[in-house]
Amino acid sequence: MPTWIVVSVYVVRDLHLSPLQLVLMGTAMEAAVFLCEVPTGVIADTYSRKLSLAIGFLGMGAAWAAVGLVSSPTAVIALWAAWGVSYTFTSGAYQAWLADEIGVESLGPALLRGARIGFVGTLLGLVALVALSTVSLQASVVAGGMLTFACGVLVAAFMPEEGFTRKPRAERGRPWAELAQTASAGARFVRARTLLVLLVVSELFAGMSSEAYDRLRDAHVLRDVGLPHAPSLGATMWFGAAGAVATVFGFFAVGVLIRRVEHRSTREVARVLVALLAVVFAAELVFARVGAFGVALVAILVVSLARSLLAPVYMTWLNQQITDSSVRATVISIAGQADAVGQAAGGPAIGAIGNAFGLRAALTAGALVLLPAVGFYGRALKHDGREPELEALPA
């Protein structure tokens, strides 16, 4: 999150990207994710989760650092696409690696505890990058990229991988045939399970909504709402302070959430997920319509907190439905691909609304698009949050 904050301010304040260009950044990224999400998930399932994670962090770090070194909107959009390709190597691979190492039954609490540790790292990184941005916003963007690149080096050097085992050499086919077989098995696994289909469709609408908020939030605050008059506090200081407050609240909220979902039923996990998504919808709608900075700031904090809790809960529920470890990363990537389709398809339309009718209209449309996702998650609860008994997946 710290690098996202300084990058989002950098492209609005220093590079002066238009609403359409801001959304096109996300569209390019999500188009890349759509094309590469499943293939890279298949690589993680076929070859190595660790290798996939290392490639992803190295690529994301390099792309972020390069954004701080260019000034052309076209170059920034292209680098965002490169970031998206790199991200797909981490999407699904991390959760699949963790499930293999500790078991699915321990995955939920581990993801939440990991999120809690992540809040600490986010706060430390936020303080460092915001402090650096007071000297040079461009330097803080480059530094954030280099830190992400360093994570890739650490993963390659020190991350264990004992739970994942490749097929014996005698059972392997040609590389492309082996990848195609894994992809086909993952797709069949999703199609055969009603609940997984509902989760994937929900991600489609969630992606459309998040694209509007993620790309237009800071522009709305800077151009429509306006920052309080405080000569000593720049935009990065305000956004950094908001991020820090959300991080502190998130740290304590995750502790409460761990106690709520640990050793609880799948239905309880599903209930928490639906509630968090409803909170995100309400807060995004308030943010889109208000003009007071204080109310907008509270809405930003609520969205940030709810979404940070939503991610590990969603992954817990999704992984509870995946009973075949050999396609785990692929199935997670299919869900991620649905999110990417939503962002790539909805982004240009919402950006055009912003250009024609203003940022408030675009953000309102983005919030309303989230309603079908809430409805689909609610429908999934009719299955008690668990997949009904089905016939075994055909070979």
Per-segment meaning from a language model:
Residues 33-71:
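Conserved MFS/SLC helix-loop-helix module at the cytosolic interface between two early adjacent transmembrane helices
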Residues 144, 149-172, 379-390:
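Helix-loop junctions on the cytosolic side of multi-pass membrane transporters
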Residues 160-199:
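Juxtamembrane intracellular "pre-TM" segments in multi-pass secondary transporters
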Residues 80-119:
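Cytoplasmic helix-loop-helix junction between adjacent transmembrane helices
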Residues 53, 270-273:
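Primarily marks hydrophobic transmembrane alpha-helices of the MFS/SLC 12-helix fold
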Residues 32-35, 238-262:
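Transmembrane alpha-helices of Major Facilitator/SLC transporters
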